[in-house]
């Protein structure tokens, strides 16, 4: 029997909505990355995009354990010499909480063309509202919450 390889036309994509309120950032990112890759489906193939769309709301209420809020630093580079910028997570979560979740999920996806395609299916919003109601997203509940 030959190994099954999913074809692009056979893949059925769902929309999932995750509430990030009081959920630890790393746990949230692992669940989101699993849904984006499609590892929860029996038709998963590591070289094909079989994943679903993920909408994360309440990104501003995400939890960080320990002293990460004060000590963890997010880096970015402008592309010019001496253009390395750094921002603490305390400031990042107040200014752009969506970016903190995007960085965490992006680090858990493949670092190639497929990963760049998968990250486009992640939609993160700081508040409780999102414009994807027409897609009828299914609520995805994460059991573990911050202590």
UniProtKB/Swiss-Prot annotation:
Position of the signal peptide: none
An example Gene Ontology biological process: translation
One Pfam family linked to the record: Ribosomal_L13
CDD domains from the UniProt entry: Ribosomal_L13
GO cellular component, one term: cytosolic large ribosomal subunit
Family under the similarity heading: Belongs to the universal ribosomal protein uL13 family.
Protein name: Large ribosomal subunit protein uL13
Gene name of the record: rplM
């Amino acid at each position: 029997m030959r190994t099954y390889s999913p074809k692009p036309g056979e893949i059925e994509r769902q929309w999932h909505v995750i509430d990030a309120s009081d959920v630890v950032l790393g746990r949230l990112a692992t669940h989101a990355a699993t849904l984006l890759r499609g590892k929860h489906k029996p038709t998963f193939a590591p070289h094909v995009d079989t994943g679903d769309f993920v909408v994360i709301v309440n990104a501003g209420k995400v939890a960080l354990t320990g002293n990460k809020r004060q000590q963890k630093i997010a880096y970015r580079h402008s592309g010019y010499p001496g253009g390395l910028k750094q921002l603490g997570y305390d400031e990042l979560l107040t200014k752009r909480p969506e970016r903190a979740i995007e960085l965490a999920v992006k680090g858990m996806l493949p670092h190639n063309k497929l990963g760049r395609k998968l990250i486009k299916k992640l939609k993160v919003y700081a508040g409780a509202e999102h414009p994807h109601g027409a897609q009828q997203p299914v609520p995805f509940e994460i059991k573990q919450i911050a202590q």
